[in-house]
Design a protein with these regions (language model features):
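Metallo-beta-lactamase
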Residues: 68-79
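Flexible loop/turn segments at secondary-structure boundaries
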Residues: 13, 38, 80, 105-106
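Structural motif
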Residues: 27-29, 67-70, 95, 166
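Conserved Rossmann-like nucleotide-binding pocket used by diverse enzymes
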Residues: 5, 72, 97
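Flexible, acidic/histidine-containing loops and adjacent segments that form or flank the divalent-metal
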Residues: 1-2, 81-214
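A generic structural signal for short
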Residues: 45, 72-73, 196
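Conserved beta-strand hairpin/beta-sheet module of binuclear metal-dependent hydrolase folds
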Residues: 1-66, 199-214
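Active-site-proximal beta-strand/loop segments in catalytic clefts of secreted hydrolases
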Residues: 20, 32-34, 74-76, 147, ...
Length: 214
């Protein structure tokens, strides 16, 4: 049986995909991790009885999920990667698949420091910093990382009944994304590059197509 949970993370996205058999988990994949905050100005406060919001990591615990076969990050907006740290507190991950992996031993990006950058550029630094910090502060929780080049569609068949494709949107942008992000971690702060990429960073995203024959 294929089970899809669209997790109510508030202003963000996170989806849990599981194949279950006899109450046992045969395969589990999380697509995105939601925001790092549930409290938003345009939503009811958390003490409101109508609120059913939950962090993705807390939802995984609630469902008894302690291991993910695959974690897919479609892009690096805060409402998609902000909850990564909480997810890694809750589960171990066999594979992380995304469009960019930070350099080994990368340090903080300090988005709120005295860098003279405009808001859009700082926002890009902040999003990537949250992502990299979550990986850095949870060593050993992810067995391996796969940076998808965008050159080909990834086909996976984790079980006989379940297969899926990870499709890359506008793969020509992936090398540029890597160049801009790598420069960040080298301490370079190109105002134009950061502003430009901050406005189009969701263009180089991933799309998932599921096939189930259970």
């Amino acid at each position: 049986m294929l089970v899809l949970d669209f997790i109510n993370v508030g202003n963000g996205d996170s989806m849990l995909i599981r194949e279950m058999e006899g109450g046992e988990q045969r395969f589990a994949m999380l697509v995105d991790c939601g925001h790092d905050k549930l409290e938003r100005d345009d939503h009811p406060p958390l003490n409101d009885a109508r609120s059913c919001r939950i962090f993705a990591g807390d939802f995984l615990r609630q469902q008894g999920v302690s291991r993910l076969d695959l974690l897919v990050l479609t892009h690096f907006h805060r409402d998609h990667i902000g909850g990564l740290g909480r997810v890694l507190e809750a589960v171990t991950v066999d594979e992380l698949a995304c469009t960019y992996l930070p350099p080994a031993h990368s340090g903080p990006l300090d988005p709120d420091g005295d860098n003279g950058l405009p808001k859009a550029a700082r926002n890009l630094l902040r999003c990537v910093d949250i992502y990299a910090e979550a990986l850095r502060s949870h060593p050993g929780r992810i067995a391996r990382g796969t940076a998808l080049s965008g050159a080909v569609t990834e086909f996976r068949q984790p079980t006989p009944a379940l297969s899926f494709e990870i499709q890359c949107n506008d793969p020509a942008l992936y090398p540029r994304q890597k160049a801009v992000y790598d420069a960040m971690f080298r301490g370079e702060r190109n105002r134009y590059d950061l502003m430009h990429w901050g406005k189009c960073m969701n263009v180089s995203s991933l799309h998932l197509r599921l096939h189930y024959h259970g």
